[in-house]
Amino acid sequence: ARDHANVLALQNDGKILAAGSEANSNASSAITPSLYRFNADGSVDTTFGNGGRAVHRFTGNSAGSLYGIKVLDDGRILVTGVSSTIHGFGAMQFLSNGQLDTTFGTGGIARINYSMGGHSVASLFLPDNSILMATVDISPTNIVLARMDSFGNPYPNFGNNGVVETGIVGKY
């Protein structure tokens, strides 16, 4: 397996979270969004998820990766990323034990479908636990913003179903 960590967060108890992806082969479809947890001493926290990792796809067999992470006040973990197969923005919410939080999105996973070519996503977690994400689209190459509420629903009054094509040229 080839695992990648794209972003880190620290829990109040000193445990370390790393979000990124794992790939079991060189095929792009084999890249799966993944969340890992380590103890304060750097050892794998085997009590988290499945042996220290929580691996879930945004939908079906879609490839993707995680690029944002926030530990919520109650210990739940909110992550954001991209699904390159369905070309969309995504978020997942986990309980502190690494299981999906089924009160978020659909079964713990939320998506905003948008044909963006599967690029990395910058994320801003707002004080009300809503999420603002940005990426660069392939065609046309412009910066695209997406916003979800704290339950994983697209903001209806933010662009078109939660997505704004800014018209500002970006670099792919």
Q: What is the role of each PLM region?
A:
Residues 1-172:
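Extracytoplasmic mature domains of secreted or surface-exposed proteins
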